[in-house]
Amino acid sequence: MFEVWRSFLSEIDPLEPEEMLFRPTSEANSIAFLVWHCPRIADTAFHRSQGMSTVWEQDKWYGKFGLAETDTGTGFAPDQVAAFRPTKKLLISHLESVQKALDDGLSQMASTDLDRPLNPENPRATLGRHIQSIVMGHGFFHLGEVRFLKGLQGRPFAR
């Protein structure tokens, strides 16, 4: 599951700050935004499904990023994305913190826990499917965006 986040780290490793903030149009996301948004969404999706507070809340990451406690990046206006200018070090620390928390949380679960329905009216909507679609599917979608943004800047994909 964490291959997507290892890939994010590999993709951003050689980038300069201006490359992290590059947006090909005023409506586009930056690499920095995407590398923050994906673990932020995964943190929320996993911990809320468990009835727990998020790493974002527990460790007050919102203060470190200068954002609201409720911000996830979903629905951000272009000017909000443009104003989002974190350091690579902060992004990496946040991603690694969320990854550790999710790894710890998942390692304490039995495989049958993943079959638990999140909504009694829709028993097919299980925790496992939720993790697969939100954490993995969403992450790989945005990883593709990161690679595209690198390519637009003449940077190769990480190998």
What are these regions (language model features)?
Residues 12, 35, 92-95:
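A generic alpha-helix structural signal
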Residues 70-116, 130-135:
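Acidic/histidine-rich alpha-helical segments that form the ligand environment
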Residues 13-16, 110, 150:
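A structural signal for long alpha-helical coiled-coils and helix-turn connectors
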Residues 6-11, 98:
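Amphipathic alpha-helical packing segments from all-alpha helical-bundle domains
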Residues 2, 9, 19-74, 117-159:
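Short, contiguous alpha-helical
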Residues 4, 30, 91-94:
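An acidic site on a long C-lobe helix of protein kinase domains
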